[in-house]
Amino acid sequence: MSLLCLADFKAQAQKQLSKTSWDFIEGEADDGITYNDNLAAFRRIRLRPRYLRDVSKIDTRTTIQGQEINAPICISPTAFHSIAWADGEKSTAKAAQKANICYVISSYASYTVEDIVAAAPGGLHWFQLYVQPDWDINKQMVQRIEALGFKALVVTVDAPVLGNRRGNKRSLLDLEANIKLKDLRSPGESKSGLPTPLSMPSSSSCWNDLPLLQSMTRLPIILKGILTKEDAELAVKHNIRGIIVSNHGGRQLDEVPASIDALREVVAAVNGKIEVYMDGGVRTGNDVLKALALGARCIFLGRPIIWGLACKGEDGVKEVLDILKEELHTCMALSGCRSVAEISPDLIQFSRL
């Protein structure tokens, strides 16, 4: 069977994965309203193409935090890739390196950051951190990723507690009891070489903690999970270098805005002072184009990467990235945009938003 679009990969991945694994990957919070709206919100947006322009050459390249990538399509931090493919994040990293895009490696990866970077030593890697109550763990993790050449630290802010994911409960998947970590261990635990039980983020983290984290690293800090003007303005005030507009794929608090709907508010609030990215609901090249037109520097993909991994491992992830890049290339040509720099809000029919 030919897999021609991301929806094809989703259908095939569901056939290949166990129900427990599928429920974990696809799991949404509560009634799944935000999960579904992430997808539906893109369908509500219409494009205003411009014609009679020379689009014989299309350039999808852009930069994020000063690093060039081949397309504004990167990989979000998602946990436990070995659920989908034995080599897990190592295969994902190899595909990202071949595509020359950024891969944000999760705190809850199946392999250590050392193993993942060794598999793709030339890749552009950011690290996603769930701030831990034990600051020695945070400091140790920052030191490790700096030594490995990571280019940014992504702090997830929308998970002070785990969302109410009914699918996981129905599958009897107890994350804290059954999943072991390779990375987030205290210095004492790490000497044993044994995985440690899943460590949940600190529920007491606040804006006042950011200066301490900034004092530990030279890396730019990106906040993932911002949805409002107020928090975006606070991010700028605290010298944060970027924001990923995200609702955690609808896995945390249900009934919050779709990421693409929140994007305009955040972009307006930062007023060009820092870079803004988004994830949540991107499934086609049209979706990428809409996000860029509304001010995202690039988009990040979550679940579709796992679908590709489940279907074909490294090759599947690369195919997912290639399909989306090719779709974006086509959409740019059909809308009159020769480069990412030419994608602007003028492409969006605001009267229908």
From Swiss-Prot:
Transmembrane parts of this sequence: none
UniProt keyword Flavoprotein, yes or no: yes
GO CC list: mitochondrion; peroxisomal matrix
Biological process terms in GO annotation: fatty acid oxidation
Main location: other
Pathway(s) served: Lipid metabolism; fatty acid metabolism
EC class name: oxidoreductase
Residues bound to FMN: P77, T78, A79, S106, Q128, T156, K224, D279, G280, G281, V282, R283, G302, R303
Active site, UniProt feature: H248
Compartments reported by the entry: Peroxisome
Pfam families named among the record's database cross-references: FMN_dh
Tissue: Pancreas.
Residues found modified as Phosphoserine: S171
Motif Microbody targeting signal, residue range(s) on this chain: 351-353
Self-association and partners: Homotetramer.
Task performed by this protein: Oxidase that catalyzes the oxidation of medium chain hydroxyacids such as 2-hydroxyoctanoate, to the correspondong 2-oxoacids. Its role in the oxidation of 2-hydroxy fatty acids may contribute to the general pathway of fatty acid alpha-oxidation. Active in vitro with the artificial electron acceptor 2,6-dichlorophenolindophenol (DCIP), but O2 is believed to be the physiological electron acceptor, leading to the production of H2O2. Is not active on glycolate, glyoxylate, L-lactate, 2-hydroxybutanoate and 2-hydroxyhexadecanoate.
Name this protein carries in UniProt: 2-Hydroxyacid oxidase 2
